Amino acid sequence: PNLLAAWWTTLDDPQLSSLIERAVAGNLNLKTAQSRLRESRARRSMAEGRLFPTLNASGSATSRRTDTNVGFDSHGEVYSAGFDAGWELDLFGGVRRSVEAAEADLTAGEEDLRDVLVSLLAETALNYVELRTFQSRLAAAEASLATQEASYELTLWRSQAGLDDELAMYQARYNLENTRSQVPSLRSGLSEAMNRLAVLLGETPGNLHAELAEPRAVPLPPERIAVGVPADTLRRRPDVRRAERELAAQTARVGVAMANLYPQLTLNGSIGLETTSLRDPLSARTWSISGGPRITLPLFDRTIRPNIEVQSALQEQALIRYEAAVLTCLEEVENALVAYGQELQRRENLREAMEAAQSAAMLAQYKYQAGLTDFGNVLEAERSLLSFQDQLRQSDGAVTSNVIRLYKALGGGWTPMTAVAATQGPAEPL
């Protein structure tokens, strides 16, 4: 489990680990999830507040003056102050069920934060691998350009010396320019990968170009990967855990709706004082004290039962979403495992094909220089070699990317001790 929680360390790339730390600290989607979690905490506190009595204080000052037409003229001030208290007795559990719903919403928010974290870690690693793959492909293309330029110079010399016709020279030139035309698209893809990575880190596109300009090899995963058992996967996946908590919240809301069928009992009380003098508030005073229960019984309300049906339907939908999340989880794990295994086999086949293409290219070049074959064979061998080199480098990236997707499907990137306190900043993935 600890290895799964910090799966990117298995790739043994310190720069990737550094980028992931920066992404956790600066990603805007993660900060949004933290803000939603703070909202859920506040809503839970609001729901819990209904379990306790309320107490309010009030005060007023009034100036009174009689009309002179009455026969005398008088004026004065009246001051009043008081306290009002109320407490809804939760006889049928409506308030408690609303607290349960808010608590489930809060835990769903925690799982949502973890889900965003898991996706962020995977997306950061995937973009980093794509970046290194583009660098590797670009290096292979540039190396092939050097070889093809030498071939072109050779055909040009042989053509000028009358040892060959111009067809070989034009074929070499065509091959050279065709390879050269692939370089701009590779550089464009490399730049786009850097920019996407910068945005994931919460930085301005272009900020990482200097930092990541030096080419490095694509990080490769270990030969053996432990994936655990399906039951463990279901327990780890934040999206499955979130769907379960959303189902619990909606189940509680059904209870809230059903509680509206029954009477509500509230205890109210108030105490007040009215006086004409602030200097001596106990003189010329009027005290008032009141209190007692209030019961509200729904005799005719045609919205209560339809609301129960609405909440029950929403509960059914939440259950279906939970079941779908479980199936999606199992599907993604199975697909990732198959993709990883098949790409390993494909990479091995490509490696053997590239080795054969290297031998063919060397032999064709030797025979051409010796005048034993025409340049068409050299041209075909160089094309095949470049193609297999490019495919092999793409396959290296695909193997690592499939491992990353597998770790994401397994819910890797957090532990049960992961801090999700929104007020304490981003959750640490370790």
Model-derived features: positions:
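Periplasmic alpha-helical coiled-coil/stalk elements that build and connect Gram-negative outer-membrane
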Residues: 95, 104, 111-229, 339, ...
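Bacterial Sec-pathway N-terminal export signals of envelope proteins
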Residues: 1-43, 218-248, 297-299, 323-326, ...
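Amphipathic alpha-helical coiled-coil scaffold segments and their short linker/junction regions
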Residues: 9, 24, 81, 95, ...
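Outer membrane beta-barrel translocator domains of Type V secretion systems
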Residues: 56-88, 94-105, 109-112
